[in-house]
Amino acid sequence: MSIAITDDHRALAGTASDFLTRRDARGAARALLEAPDEALPPFWDDLVGLGWLGLHVPEEHGGSGYGLEELVVVVEALGRAVAPGPFVPTVIASATLAAVGGEIAKTHLPGLADGSVAGAVALGGAVTVDGDTAIGSAGAVLGGGLAQLLLVAAGDDVAVVEMGEGVSVETPPNMDPTRRTARVTLDGAPATVLPGARRTLVDLARVILAAEAVGLARECTEQAAAYAKERIQFGRPIAMFQAVKHHCANMVVATELATSAVWDAARAAASGGDQLTYAAAVAATLAAPAADLCANLNTQVHGGIAITWEHDAHLYLRRATTLLPLLAADTAAAELTDLTREGVARARTVELPPEAEAIRDEVRAFAERIRDLSPDDQRTELIDSGYAMPHWPTPWGRAAGAVEQLVIEQEFAAAGIARPAYGITGWVILTLIQYATDDQVARWVRPALDQEVVWCQLFSEPDAGSDAAGIKARATRVEGGWLVNGQKVWTSGAHLAGMGFATVRTNPDVPKHEGITTVVIDMHADGVEVRPLRMTTGGSEFNEVFFNDVFVPDDDVVGPVDGGWTVARATLGNESVSIGGGQGGMSMPGSG
């Protein structure tokens, strides 16, 4: 998924992608590889005409009046096309001036927004300002060779310098000739100081550069996956080889994490302050390594062809490599650690559609009614009303969709109401609701919701971890039920649980997925032995569990005999959703 998730943003992304494809932005980048000098790309005037340089600039300064949320959509598309030109440094400069405001914004924003002025930014260097002049090396300046306006960090401040008197620009050979950085030295250059603006400049630069990194990462991921599907070796597509699969999967994971971080950071720009600093640091920490990883793995998946001059892989590798020092992920991560130690955390808010308000009235009224009840009475009301686990089917939940669930979270948080935390018990009980008989549901569900009984999940074995169907614990038919023998391991909370949900092998003579049955085991029954495993922390949260002729009555078999794999897979799915929603760990009485 790209940064664009709304209909309007997806339309903008599509327009940007189509434009860059039609104007052959990647070809324009390639043309600069051996060009002696950097020039504006041939599509620059058309790009300016689309108004993208002013997307985020207030209307009174010649922009469109949108925000960073729209800007990063375009920047991601530019990254995917490895587009040349000073777009990125120009919009970093204009975003900073727009955030600071004042007379300097009135002076410079119109030119930056209409493309008559190109911007450059310097985040490092050693520049000092004495009165109204700037002195020192600005270091590596992105866009310095094409710019008319420079924003350079100077201590905690930012110096705004018009290229001209007192400014020396040298463009040495670049790792990425398609978008070059320059060495800029200031020697008494006239400067306007933006007091305390360095933080704003760095934050906004991180968000915008990270958006470009996401575009690079996503394009490299898609190129690698497409090539792996079509490249045949040893009589099959290389996409069928595990090592290649893992490369592509790692690329997807890195890209999606970075995408989410940039999306969130762009939203944080409206808040500014620590919220923006925190989110921008997260984006930089994730996006720079993602682009670097994906550019390198794209080269590896393509093999020898990717290290030829004619292939485009090295264009992406060059751009990703130059983004590493600009985004400085290690520095961002260290700052993020400091912010966390200071108690800064990201405020989580989501803009909900209009239909949320009708739901909100009902939820708020319920929350107000139960907020002053005792914890036990409050839990009972939550269970009876379905609010304890609102996404569960009725009558145990409310069959709530995503919008209703978010409204419930918001209103309960505002009222100080904590829903019970069921953890493993929750996802096991949901499976029972889905697959158990009415009698079994009546026996097991409500006591678990009341937190009278804690459950554990008895799936993993010494030889069946990720291969959950490779279990050897066996159940042998006896009068009235089954005798279970075998071992489970890594069973979280087995030492605390009253009941366990287990996979056992009831038919060893069929393929492994077909001979599995799911059963409920009383953890205090004769023949059950739980041995806690000591962890690196010194504590014990998971266990070995041994079964020695443990009797399980027929009434405690869940689903069809030999048909338990379907039930087990449902449980694993419920586990993933629960953990992803923050419902991990163990349920204990009074937990919330």
Task: Enumerate the language-model features and the residues they cover.
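Hydrophobic, small-residue-rich alpha-helical packing segments that form membrane-like cores
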Residues: A464-D467, G481-W482, T491
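Glycine-rich beta->alpha junctions and the first turn(s) of the following alpha-helix
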Residues: S2-G14, G79-R80, V169-E256, R348-P354, ...
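C-terminal helix-coil-helix/basic helical segment that borders enzyme active sites and/or dimer interfaces
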Residues: G27-A35, Q233, V252-L286, Q300-H302
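A structural signal for short hydrophobic beta-strand segments in well-ordered beta-sheet cores
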Residues: V127-V129, A473-T476
